[in-house]
Regions:
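Short, non-transmembrane amphipathic alpha-helical segments
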Residues: 245-265
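Intrinsic structural disorder
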Residues: 212, 256-259, 270
Length: 270
């Protein structure tokens, strides 16, 4: 949890002075720890004054997690915790876990040829959202978007901040529910995202909506149907034996994706 240092300094001053019984949500703090709050606030206040940090990062982990982390091998410690968790979800919940690797490459080809392969969101977030893109397939179609969004918003992921988590959750919400779908929970997550990151979440959702309609989540198909941006057009290339996949639904979603990219679309033969 990352907060501006000024916000933390203002809060600890409030805790130092306030009657604890009057603080909102004080019931969330155990009665045994409440008498120590003012002392902890004083220490944190002094740390901020002396260290002059721009931001304060509060770990979501605790002593027990740290003890377990110390017992891991160096190789395990070096692993990216977010990608590890996303791969686990993909392995446990996707129809065909092999499909995610192909989707990563397929999505990157579109982003790179569209000139959108920048640093925001980071490549690891792009990879993670691809790995999480099929976790809701077992749910009823009417609820897949909302359920998948809630799973990601509350999952025990580490190595990710609030903006990154909201990006993942909203991209998968719109992948299932549609690009114009809405809900109170989705609105709350949108409030966390800068406009460029929200736009990228919608773009990834649009890419997934085309990819899954073409591949049904099965490995071995997307590499045979490359999609790239060339000379102001989004071009989907289909081999002769897969040409019947160019249904009205696929064309509609391809047109929607091309619009987000600011391009025309074309379906060509390989």
């Amino acid at each position: 949890y990352t907060l501006p240092a000024k916000d933390v300094a203002d809060f600890v001053k409030l805790v130092e002075r306030a009657d604890l019984t009057g603080l909102p949500a004080i019931d969330a703090v155990s009665s045994a720890r409440r008498p120590l709050l003012a002392y902890g606030a004083l220490v944190l206040d002094e740390l901020i004054k002396r260290g002059k940090p721009r931001a304060v990062i509060i770990s979501a982990q605790g002593v027990r997690e740290g003890l377990l982390h110390e017992q891991l091998s160096e190789e395990e410690r070096a692993a990216d915790p977010l990608l590890r968790a996303a791969r686990d979800y993909n392995h446990l919940r996707a129809r065909d876990p092999r499909h995610a690797a192909e989707l990563i490459a397929w999505s990157r080809a579109i982003l790179e040829t569209a000139g959108l392969a920048g640093d925001e969101p980071s490549p690891r977030l792009i990879e993670s959202v691809c790995l999480l893109s099929d976790i809701g397939w077992r749910a009823h179609p009417d609820y897949r978007g909302e359920q998948s969004m809630n799973v990601i918003a509350h999952a025990y992921f580490t190595g990710i901040d609030h903006v990154g988590r909201a990006f993942l959750a909203l991209a998968i919400f719109h992948r299932y529910a549609g690009l114009k779908a809405d809900s109170p929970a989705a609105n709350a997550l949108r409030a966390l995202l800068p406009t460029p990151i929200l736009d990228r979440a919608l773009l990834l959702a649009a890419i997934f909506r085309v990819a899954y309609l073409l591949s049904a989540g099965m490995a071995g198909l997307l590499p045979r149907m490359p999609a790239t941006c060339v000379d102001g057009r989004l071009i989907l290339r289909l081999p002769e034996d897969l040409a019947p996949l160019a249904s009205d639904r696929v064309i509609g979603r391809l047109k929607q994706l091309a619009k987000l990219l600011g391009r025309d679309y074309e379906i060509a033969r390989l």
